[in-house]
Amino acid sequence: MDFKQLEKQYRDELLQNVIPFWLEKSQDKEYGGYFTCLDRQGNVFDTDKFIWLQAREVWLFSMLYNRVEKRQEWLDTAIQGAEFLKKYGHDGHLNWYFSLDQQGNPLVEPYNIFSYTFATMAFGQLSIATANQEYADIAKKTFDIILSKQENPKGKWSKAHPGTRSLKNFALPMILCNLALEIEPLLEPSFIEKAMEACIHEVMEVFLRPELGGIVVENVNTDGSLSDTFEGRHLNPGHAIEAMWFIMDLGKRLNRPELIEKAVQTTLTMLNYGWDKQYGGIYYFMDRKGCPPQQLEWDQKLWWVHIETLISLIKGYQLTGNKECLEWFEKVHNYTWQHFKDPKHREWWGYLNRQGEVLLDLKGGKWKGCFHVPRGLYQVWKTIEKLNVQE
């Protein structure tokens, strides 16, 4: 692969195609915040605002401002979204709602812990860009609330009957791996080291299962044992692979090459397991025993799964020189650019059927916003840049 050309391809796609799309199409100039329900051309088809996606867009533009270029336009975009979130996104005690209407009235109660994690990321990154102490405080206080909710993330909003089947889920420790590095500048060093070790332990010792051939499961019993239930058999290959680049970043930060190596091997294991050998692409959901999955969309091909996989593969190659990572990167790169990039209009499709045909031609919705595509393009660009410097 021509790394010089690839570096340019990812950088240009980010800065000339994807970012201008969100800058132009997503900002609500009337009420603040962002529209994320955007059709193929970028027209708004629903005005509700989802806290995950509002916060992710604040984070993304803050991150670009901090790491790529001090463009005022990017900072202004992040600040206006953050001010909307600060005013309307929570109940006054930093319990973050799931969704709001266009004006900022709450629609869905604060049942979802990931509203909190993305708010922490957003205000943490923006506080670095602005040196604004209020933003830093919001990030730190929200992070404290997340830690207090770790054992029971949904709290009073949980539908599960207490005590019958207590499962713990992979998503929170996985996100905390990323969050620990994201807001490290705001926290005490001794606390951060402990938090990092705890996350690594959960991801690599609890959810990664050597007895299943080294795959990562989404749910285990609270005592760490496997559960032979829909939830306990549930696999999400993209989630597991995304977590592995967080672990690689932690391995680099903590100078632990053996951890990086394990994350690389797990990436390859999950990719071999999750790749659709008939049509190409990575399955959305699987069942570890090969039973019929609960989710009807199990065989769809989703944008974020493939983009996160590209990040893990190129980081794995850059950090270890593993040739299998590079071979897979080429294969996943070709599939992703061929199937998800819209050849006529800006931004990428999110949802394909199993055969790789466009299922929904939207560019944003309730779950797809200004996050996985631009973050992925940025991460791959910067990793390939390192490879080019190494050469």
What are these regions, as identified by a protein language model?
Residues 1-391:
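Glycan-recognition and catalytic cores of secretory/periplasmic carbohydrate-active enzymes
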